[in-house]
Regions:
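Hydrophobic alpha-helical segments and helix pairs
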Residues: 78-126
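Conserved active-site tyrosine of GNAT-family acetyltransferases
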Residues: 97-102, 237-239, 243
Length: 256
């Protein structure tokens, strides 16, 4: 396993993967790669495969390119590995084969997610304003509500930028943050990255208030969310608010 020193050094490796029949879960932009290189990006090249390992606090995220007939193997690891395999329905068979290859190396399925999309809606005129919360408070709340390895919590600098840009909408009370919605803006649509309500505040409409804040912030823009399958309250909330499955699904795997 070797560390990537620059995007210029990585680009030829990536170009070699652009062939028919290659299965991948890697959809990063050059800017994304540069951030990963700065934080710690490693790679392993083998017989029909390229693995990219992205450094996180106490674990690594795994991305892969698998050619037909690849003889997949993993470099020695001292940290847990997490990977997510996302695909449309027409690509399910190929991604299932990739999952089987990873599970043969010791990965275990954690859960599945389904992407739901809601068409644009009229922006509310009377949505309340979000309360301000510090980066430290937001980070602590996310770590309380989501698994630190599989919860897609951004690296500190990325999260700090999201807080500064107003992309983390909060409700607060005397006990701190009571509800939080973290979203990623986009030209065609926004995406909800995290939506959580503190345990003692659930069942009182907090999630709906946060969604109204998002609609006001984005002008009612089309919106997508990856929601965990089998979490009934979340599934009911999104269905009630017209978020419909759009054909994309994923499985989250972990090793270690």
């Amino acid at each position: 396993m070797r560390r990537v020193e620059s995007y210029a050094a990585l680009a030829p490796l990536l170009s070699a993967q652009l062939r028919r029949g290659v299965v991948t879960n890697c959809f990063l932009s050059p800017a994304d790669y540069q951030r990963e290189i700065d934080a710690g990006l490693f790679y392993e090249e083998g017989d029909g495969f390229l693995l990219l390992l992205r450094q996180r606090a106490g674990y690594r995220l795994l991305n892969f390119y698998l050619h037909p007939g690849a003889k997949l193997c993993l470099p020695g690891q001292t940290l847990p590995l997490v990977t997510e395999l996302a695909c449309r329905e027409k690509d399910q068979d190929a991604m299932r084969r990739a999952q089987d290859a990873l599970c043969a190396l010791g990965f275990a399925e954690c859960f599945r997610r389904l992407r739901r999309t809601r068409a644009a809606v009229p922006a509310p005129n009377n949505a309340e304003a979000p309360t301000e919360a510090s980066f430290e408070a937001v980070r602590a709340f996310l770590l309380e509500q989501f698994d630190p390895l599989t919860g897609c919590i951004p690296p500190d600098e990325e999260l700090r930028q999201a807080v500064s840009a107003g992309q983390v909408l909060c409700l607060s009370d005397a006990d701190g943050i009571s509800g939080l919605l973290h979203y990623a803006p986009g030209r065609a649509q926004c995406e909800i990255r995290h939506l959580a309500v503190r345990a003692d505040c659930r069942g009182h409409g907090y999630a709906g208030r946060l969604l109204a804040m998002l609609e006001a912030k984005t002008g009612g823009q089309k919106c997508a969310v990856w929601a965990r399958v089998g979490t009934a309250p979340a599934e009911h909330f999104y269905e009630k608010n017209q978020f419909q499955p759009d054909g994309w699904q994923s499985v989250v795997l972990r090793l270690g």
